A protein has these predicted regions:
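Flexible gly/pro-rich beta->alpha loop and the following alpha-helix that scaffold active-site loops
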Residues: 27-86, 98
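Glycine-rich nucleophile elbow surrounding the catalytic serine of serine-hydrolase chemistry
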Residues: 87-95
């Protein structure tokens, strides 16, 4: 089985220090999943087949991205059938691909662990407490919730902390579940839940 890990940074932002962060996410996925993890830039997604796709975050604002390249990505996402998880900017990409909007957050969050309240624990957030601590760092947010999506989590500084589009098997988190540790384990369970939803066996 294969997981496509998609780097959502624009081409000019693929700096060595950022690539190190993305490779760390790749290693976390490989640590959890009995599957090959293939890392690609979002401009290459259309040429890669996968059983599940994970969209990374992005350090730079959307204005730094080529609008045509983003439109091509949205088309590729809509044409694919496998489950997709969007992380931070990756969630924003899913919302935009689904007809939603992204705007500057009124209260930028992080960097650091913050409390998030689960609204729907039926799939991606299954097994979590109602309030969990997750790592967050973002200046934009999805608002309003796009039509056909449901909100899974919220917080005092971000109305849509996690979402799902059931008809497409898309899930997203505004926070970074890959940033877990012994004191803040929720992110690991969220990634494991996504892998189960995608039919990817766990190690």
């Amino acid at each position: 089985m294969r997981i496509a890990f998609v780097i959502s940074e624009h081409a000019g932002g693929l700096l060595p220090e950022r690539m190190g962060q993305y490779h760390a996410v790749e290693r976390r996925l490989a640590h959890l999943a009995r599957a090959e993890v293939t890392t690609v830039h979002y401009s290459e997604l259309g040429a890669v087949g996968a059983d599940a796709t994970v969209l990374s975050g992005s350090a730079d604002p959307w204005s730094a991205h080529d609008p045509t390249a983003l439109d091509d990505l949205f088309g590729s996402l809509r044409a694919r059938n496998e489950p997709v998880l969007g992380i931070c900017a990756g969630m924003q990409l899913l919302a935009r691909a689904g007809g939603g909007e992204v705007r500057t957050a009124s209260r930028p969050a992080g960097p650091g662990f913050v409390n998030v309240d689960a609204l729907d624990r039926s799939d991606l957030l299954a097994g979590l407490e109602r309030r969990v601590s997750v790592w967050e760092h973002h200046t934009d947010e999805v608002l309003p919730l796009p039509m056909g999506f449901r909100a899974l989590a919220t917080s005092e500084h971000c109305a849509v902390e996690a979402l799902a589009a059931d008809d497409r098997r898309w899930w997203g988190t505004q926070f970074h579940p890959e940033e877990w540790n012994g004191d803040h384990p929720a992110g690991r369970l969220i990634l494991e839940n996504f892998l189960r939803l995608a039919g990817i066996p766990l190690r």
